[in-house]
From Swiss-Prot:
<comment type="function">
    <text>May be involved in response to stresses.</text>
</comment>
<dbReference type="GO" id="GO:0005576">
    <property type="term" value="C:extracellular region"/>
</dbReference>
<keyword id="KW-0272">Extracellular matrix</keyword>
<keyword id="KW-0964">Secreted</keyword>
<comment type="similarity">
    <text>Belongs to the Cyclase 1 superfamily.</text>
</comment>
<dbReference type="Pfam" id="PF04199">
    <property type="entry name" value="Cyclase"/>
</dbReference>
<dbReference type="GO" id="GO:0019441">
    <property type="term" value="P:L-tryptophan catabolic process to kynurenine"/>
</dbReference>
<keyword id="KW-0346">Stress response</keyword>
<keyword id="KW-0732">Signal</keyword>
<dbReference type="InterPro" id="IPR037175">
    <property type="entry name" value="KFase_sf"/>
</dbReference>
<feature type="signal peptide">
    <location>
        <begin position="1"/>
        <end position="23"/>
    </location>
</feature>
<dbReference type="GO" id="GO:0004061">
    <property type="term" value="F:arylformamidase activity"/>
</dbReference>
<protein>
    <recommendedName>
        <fullName>Cyclase-like protein 3</fullName>
    </recommendedName>
</protein>
<dbReference type="InterPro" id="IPR007325">
    <property type="entry name" value="KFase/CYL"/>
</dbReference>
Length: 270
C-alpha cells in the first residue's frame, strides 16, 4: 500500500515546493529572490573631484594607506578595518577606523601647541564654523622659498580678506601624493606668520601640506598663529588644477570634543 502512495507523495511535494519558495522571504532584504541575470550591468561608483558641472570643487584628499604621515616613511598604513562583514555572515557591513587626527586634510585647534588651551577645552568642537565657511582667496605663492614676511608683503592681500588658501611648491611637487614625509615642504617661517597676524585680517589659513609651518620653524610659527585663538589652520588641502581667485569655502571638521585636530572636508564653490 505504501509503495503505491510513494509516487503520489513525491508528486505532491514537487507541486508544493514552488509555493513554499514564493512564501519564504529572502535571507537578506538587500538581495532579491531572483538570481541576478548574467547580462545585468554591475554598477560602478563615480569618483569625482568636481560636482555640479564643475561649480563645486572638492579640495579634500581622500584617505589612503600610502598618503604621507608626519615624520614617517611608511605613510599612514592601514587605517580602516571591516570587523563585521556581510560576506562573513553579518547582517550589515560595519567598518572601524583609526588614524592620527593630523593626517590628510585636517584642521588644527589652539590646543595643538598650547597645553593650557588644551586643558581649558579649546578643542575642535570649540572652533567657529563661521570662520570655516565663507568667501576665501586662493593665492599662488612664489615657488622659491618658504613663506616669509617679505613674501607675505609681496602678495598684497587686501584688507578685509579673512580666509586665504596658500598654494605653494608643495602642490607642484605633489607632496601629498607621496608616501614618504618630506621635511623640505613649503610653510610659514615665524616672521611670515607674524607679518600675517600684524598686517592682515586673515582668520583662516589654508595650505597644501601637512603643516602651515615650515619644518625649521614648526613650533614658533604655530605659536604665533594660534596664540590669540582667532586664526584657524587648515592643512593638507588639495589645490591642484584650480584657478586663483575668490571662492565660497566650506569646511566642516568632525565634532570631536577633547581633540586638538580633526579630519575635515573642504569644498570650494565658484
Amino acid at each position: 500500500m505504501m509503495a503505491h502512495l510513494a509516487p503520489l507523495f513525491l508528486l505532491l511535494l514537487l507541486l508544493l515546493l514552488p509555493l513554499h519558495a514564493a512564501a519564504t522571504p529572502s535571507a537578506h532584504p538587500a538581495y532579491p529572490n531572483e538570481p541576478p541575470s548574467c547580462a545585468a550591468a554591475v554598477p560602478v561608483p563615480e569618483r569625482r573631484e568636481a560636482h555640479g558641472g564643475g561649480r563645486i570643487l572638492d579640495i579634500t584628499h581622500y584617505y589612503r594607506e600610502d598618503m604621507p604621515s608626519w615624520e614617517s616613511d611608511g605613510g599612514v598604513g592601514q587605517f580602516l578595518w571591516l570587523p563585521a562583514s556581510m560576506r562573513n555572515g553579518s547582517r550589515a557591513n560595519n567598518s572601524e577606523m583609526r588614524l592620527p587626527t593630523h593626517t590628510g586634510t585636517h584642521v588644527d585647534a589652539p590646543g595643538h601647541v598650547f597645553q593650557h588651551y588644551f586643558d581649558a577645552g579649546f578643542d575642535v568642537d570649540s572652533l567657529d564654523l563661521e570662520v570655516l565657511n565663507g568667501l576665501a582667496l586662493l593665492v599662488d605663492v612664489p615657488r622659491d622659498d618658504n613663506i616669509t614676511a617679505k613674501m607675505m608683503e609681496s602678495l598684497h592681500i587686501p584688507k578685509g580678506i579673512q580666509r586665504v588658501l596658500f598654494r605653494t611648491l608643495n602642490t607642484d611637487r605633489q607632496l601629498m601624493w607621496k608616501k614618504e614625509f618630506d621635511t623640505s615642504y613649503v610653510g610659514f617661517m615665524e616672521d611670515g606668520a607674524q607679518w600675517l597676524v600684524d598686517n592682515t585680517d586673515i582668520k583662516l589659513v589654508g595650505i597644501d601640506y601637512l603643516s602651515v609651518a615650515a619644518f625649521d620653524d614648526l613650533i614658533p610659527s604655530h605659536l604665533v598663529l594660534l596664540k590669540n585663538r582667532d586664526i584657524i589652520l587648515v592643512e593638507g588641502l588639495k589645490l591642484e588644477n584650480i584657478m586663483p581667485g575668490i571662492y565660497s569655502l566650506h569646511c566642516l571638521p568632525l565634532r570631536l570634543r577633547g581633540a586638538e585636530g580633526s579630519p575635515i572636508r573642504c569644498i570650494l564653490i565658484k
